[in-house]
Amino acid sequence: MAADKSVDNTKKIIGIDDITDTKTIWRCLAAELIGTLLLVLIGTGSCTGVQISEGDVVVRIALTFGFIIATMVQCIGHVSGCHINPAVTCGLLVTGHISILKAIFYIIVQCVGAIAGSAILKVITPAEFRGTLCMTSLAPGVTPPMGFLVEACITFVLILLVQSVCDDRRKNLGNAAPVAVGLAITCCHLAAIKYTGSSMNPARSFGPAVNGDDNWANHWVYWAGPIVGGVVAGITYRALFRARKPEEEASSYDF
């Protein structure tokens, strides 16, 4: 019996059943692809051909990203969880809310969606207004280690909120999740745009990097920072804030 339970738990962690349930997995992957595509298309569309130094532009960009993500959470949250961000997927992976194989597929389609969204923006935007397609880059004077810490910190805030929203002990959320996530995104953008462009999302940075020109300088910052921040936030929430009840029917996996 113990051996059978161990095998079943291992299968859940790896996600064999998730992948073999083809109808469900394809719906989830389609939702993640379309969600990330729209995030990048609408979000980065708000900052093509503008100077980030303009104060009103910073507010516009922050609100656009916050609103589009809140919209996507409402649209596809019930389908795939609306990760649309590899850092979110990694943060939920370490807390057992998603299996390994499913997480890998999510990250792949998120990157594909981001590339497609940025490509569409490039096609529909006149050349004189494209700029860098809202590619994230470090501001003058911001070193890669500084950028890494900024991205890790703001992503920590986002994933801590996501973990709270996903906590199955909470019964008081109602329909607040989209608003909460949107506000967190807006807040972090307002704080960090002038440092790193406020990515918090490797796919969001990857799409414009693929479609733009001369755009890979310090790109690692936008993968390492958010993923580290997301993983640390996931571990922190699970260790400090998520109650462990012996009688509860856990919806997560024990690693």
From Swiss-Prot:
Keywords from the named record: Membrane, Repeat, Transmembrane, Transmembrane helix, Transport
Topological domains, Cytoplasmic: 1-29, 82-103, 163-172, 237-255
Membrane topology: Multi-pass membrane protein
Gene Ontology CC terms: plasma membrane
Tissue expression: Filter chamber epithelium in the digestive tract. Absent from midgut.
Compartments it resides in: Membrane
Molecular function terms from GO: channel activity
Segments traversing the membrane: 30-50, 61-81, 104-124, 142-162, 173-193, 216-236
Written domain comment of the UniProt record: Aquaporins contain two tandem repeats each containing three membrane-spanning domains and a pore-forming loop with the signature motif Asn-Pro-Ala (NPA).
PANTHER family referenced in this protein's UniProt entry, alphabetically: AQUAPORIN, AQUAPORIN TRANSPORTER
NCBIfam families, per database record: MIP
Protein name in UniProt: Aquaporin AQPcic
Gene: AQP
